[in-house]
Amino acid sequence: MKREHSNQYFTEAQKLFPGGVNSPVRAFKAVGGHPLFIEKASGAYLHDVDGNRYIDYVLSWGPMILGHAPKDVLPAVEEAIWEGTSFGAPSPREIALGQLVQERLPFMERMRMVNSGTEATMSAIRVARGVTKRSKIVKFIGCYHGHSDSFLVQAGSGLASFGIADSAGVIAQVAGETLALPYNDTDALKTCFEKYGDDIACVILEAVAGNMGLIPADADFINTIRSLTQEYGSLFIVDEVMSGFRAHYQGAVGLYQTEPDLVCLGKVIGGGFPVAAFGGKAVYMDQVAPLGSIYQAGTLSGNPVAMTAGYETLKQLTPELFAEIEEKTSYLCDGLRSLADKYSISLQVVSKGTMFGFFFSQKPVRNFEDSKAADHAQFARLHGLLLEEGIYLAPSQYETNFMSSAHTRADLDQTLAAFEQAFQEMKEEANG
């Protein structure tokens, strides 16, 4: 495929933005080459500035569960735009979205709309510290909760793609309040609470981790977190910025039938607009300003256009439609497993709901150490081969892929055919 114009745009972008991008993973550093510059998107497809079309499994990193430019959402968004793009005041549209979220997640007795997943997670941590009067937080190695200083300790995802354990610019005093433990390790968790339990404000968890590749938590691990946080008076926060309304119709909390104290949402609830939320039990959330002394604010929080996009997206995402998207995910993943077996390729294919990923690994991947040990060079080669065939996957083995209602069976079969061609070529290369 020709990429002349993408390369030209990338040259210009590097004069303006660090690395030529406005989010690091878009730079394609983990897979080689230059990023694609996208001109438009519709349904399951991206169209780049060179006129190439790609079947898209990145879907803006998860939000576009109905596909790009969904016809059942855009008319309401256009109407909202003409009624005013930002009020800086409450509107009925934020109530409509909040009620729909609460209907699906009843334990979210109170919530606050914000503009990004990072804003949601950092605010939830502030609530936990304000409520408990404690300073330490527990996170898990490889889980990414945004780029707030407290979270950039063994954070996986973008940092891992660049071989960075922690970010420069995070002062030691802040990093020292974050206790980073191995994912899916109940013994390490128990030991941590025995040592620091009275100082721990909260445990924050990606119950379906999507930033060290797709790695679901063990049910026993989640149950242990819930019991220890209750025993020690710490809050349990589930970060569902990625998995919310993706891993299950009710997100990871629905998948595992657990009830955290606070939850963070994002991506899908904005329908492609910058929307996120944090919320949970009223006893905690009612301590947020203006009712309480835990401060959080945002000029564009509850933006009426973004609220409309989120509302219309969730309204369309019925249990029946979710099941259809989940079935498509299973169909594709079953096909990948069959192809890996056919070509004797050690591939661990993982899916939860409408999310999927895979690792070039001989054994199941349960934590960040397993993920790092997977063959990332093979993934980079595969990514390049698939891109040439018009298949757009997340450009890092540490990232997760997504399915939408817009993907057709023909799209899935074309994708599997491209995988087969790539596997065959990789096998021939390996055999010399």
From Swiss-Prot:
Pathway: Porphyrin-containing compound metabolism; protoporphyrin-IX biosynthesis; 5-aminolevulinate from L-glutamyl-tRNA(Glu): step 2/2
Keyword Isomerase (UniProt): yes
Cellular localization per UniProt: Cytoplasm
Modified residues (N6-(pyridoxal phosphate)lysine): K267
GO molecular function annotation: glutamate-1-semialdehyde 2,1-aminomutase activity; pyridoxal phosphate binding; transaminase activity
PROSITE patterns membership: AA_TRANSFER_CLASS_3
Primary localisation category: cytoplasm
Listed cofactors: pyridoxal 5'-phosphate
Presence of the UniProt keyword Cytoplasm in the record: yes
CDD domains, sorted: OAT_like
Any GO BP annotation: protoporphyrinogen IX biosynthetic process
Catalysed reactions, semicolon-separated: (S)-4-amino-5-oxopentanoate = 5-aminolevulinate
Subunit text: Homodimer.
Identification of the protein by name: Glutamate-1-semialdehyde 2,1-aminomutase
